[in-house]
């Protein structure tokens, strides 16, 4: 039995400040929730080993500051991502409206090989609160218009749908990682023009 190499999946969580990105990550990785809000400065990450379809993978989940002054974290931060998670607060409509700009920001910075099919997952967080202002159908319609992005309604506080959402994130990230590996195994052929071919045949003929 051949041993499979370890797979590291890079997942980036984006969204406005205060939507619960850190809380979702902590709930998923550490099964903990804190009511004390502490803004993330720059970026931080946690890792978790998970089974995806009988394969053990390590997820490296990057949490980002939502403040605009941290929005340009640099190309190196985004590059190599296998999945991008977009988070909004269902009680704050403005955080939903900015999903477009977060998605665009990621695609510009990460410049994935196949942007049309790059895996995103959207989380509508804080469904445990009563003053909901973003309807489920509205969020689903946005996701459908963006190549049918998977959508989950979550509560980091009550641990609602967090595990299920990250299972989908891991599965989609693994699929993306596998496709990139296959693509890299078959480099693009180098095309020679007529002059190059003539030059090559002349150099190989030592008569």
Swiss-Prot record:
User: Which residue numbers does the motif Switch 2 cover?
Assistant: 67-82
Report the residues modified as N-acetylthreonine. Answer: 2
**Primary residence:** membrane
Superkingdom of origin: Eukaryota
Q: Which reaction does it catalyse?
A: GTP + H2O = GDP + phosphate + H(+)
Covalent lipid adducts (S-geranylgeranyl cysteine), residues: 205, 207
Give residue numbers for the modification (Cysteine methyl ester).
Answer: 207
**What's noted about post-translational modification?**
Deubiquitination at Lys-191 and Lys-194 by USP32. Phosphorylated at Ser-72 by LRRK1; phosphorylation is dependent on protein kinase C (PKC) activation of LRRK1.
Crosslink Glycyl lysine isopeptide (Lys-Gly) (interchain with G-Cter in ubiquitin): position given as: 191, 194
Q: Which GO terms describe its molecular function?
A: G protein activity; GTP binding
Keyword Nucleotide-binding belongs to the record: yes
Tell me what controls its activity. Answer: Regulated by guanine nucleotide exchange factors (GEFs) which promote the exchange of bound GDP for free GTP. Regulated by GTPase activating proteins (GAPs) which increase the GTP hydrolysis activity. Inhibited by GDP dissociation inhibitors (GDIs).
Q: How does it sit in the membrane?
A: Peripheral membrane protein
Task: Give residues annotated as binding GTP.
Answer: 17-23, 34-35, 37, 40, 66, 125-126, 128, 156-157
Gene Ontology cellular-component terms listed: autophagosome membrane; cytosol; late endosome; late endosome membrane; lipid droplet; lysosomal membrane; melanosome membrane; mitochondrial membrane
Which Pfam family, an example, fits this chain? Ras
Kindly state the positions of the motif Switch 1 in this protein. Answer: 28-41
Q: Report the cofactors.
A: Mg(2+)
Domain characteristics, as noted in the entry: Switch I, switch II and the interswitch regions are characteristic of Rab GTPases and mediate the interactions with Rab downstream effectors. The switch regions undergo conformational changes upon nucleotide binding which drive interaction with specific sets of effector proteins, with most effectors only binding to GTP-bound Rab.
Known partners and oligomeric status? Interacts with NTRK1/TRKA. Interacts with RILP. Interacts with PSMA7. Interacts with RNF115. Interacts with FYCO1. Interacts with the PIK3C3/VPS34-PIK3R4 complex. The GTP-bound form interacts with OSBPL1A. The GTP-bound form interacts with RAC1. Interacts with CLN3. Interacts with CHM, the substrate-binding subunit of the Rab geranylgeranyltransferase complex. Interacts with C9orf72. Does not interact with HPS4 and the BLOC-3 complex (heterodimer of HPS1 and HPS4). Interacts with CLN5. Interacts with PLEKHM1 (via N- and C-terminus). Interacts with PRPH; the interaction is direct.
Instruction: Outline what the protein does.
Output: The small GTPases Rab are key regulators of intracellular membrane trafficking, from the formation of transport vesicles to their fusion with membranes. Rabs cycle between an inactive GDP-bound form and an active GTP-bound form that is able to recruit to membranes different sets of downstream effectors directly responsible for vesicle formation, movement, tethering and fusion. In its active state, RAB7A binds to a variety of effector proteins playing a key role in the regulation of endo-lysosomal trafficking.
Q: What is this protein called?
A: Ras-related protein Rab-7a
Gene name of this polypeptide: RAB7A
């Amino acid at each position: 039995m051949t041993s499979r190499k370890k797979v590291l999946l890079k997942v980036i969580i984006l969204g406005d400040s205060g939507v619960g990105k850190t809380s979702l990550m902590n709930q998923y990785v550490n099964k903990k929730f804190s009511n004390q809000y502490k803004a993330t400065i720059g970026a931080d990450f946690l890792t978790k080993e998970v089974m995806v379809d009988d394969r053990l993978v390590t997820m490296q989940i990057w949490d980002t500051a939502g403040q605009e002054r941290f929005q340009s974290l640099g190309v190196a931060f985004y590059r190599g991502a296998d999945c991008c998670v977009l988070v909004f607060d269902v009680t704050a409509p403005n955080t939903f409206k900015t999903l477009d700009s977060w998605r665009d920001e990621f695609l510009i910075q990460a410049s994935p090989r196949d942007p049309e099919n790059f895996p995103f997952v959207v989380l509508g967080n804080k469904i445990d609160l009563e003053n909901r202002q973003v309807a489920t159908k509205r969020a689903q319609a946005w996701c459908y218009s963006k190549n049918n992005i998977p959508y989950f309604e979550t509560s980091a506080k009550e641990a609602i749908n967090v595990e299920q959402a990250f299972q989908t994130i891991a599965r989609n990230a693994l699929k993306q990682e596998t496709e990139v590996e296959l693509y890299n195994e078959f480099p693009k052929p180098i095309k020679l023009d007529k002059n190059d071919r003539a030059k090559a045949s002349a150099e190989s003929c030592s008569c």
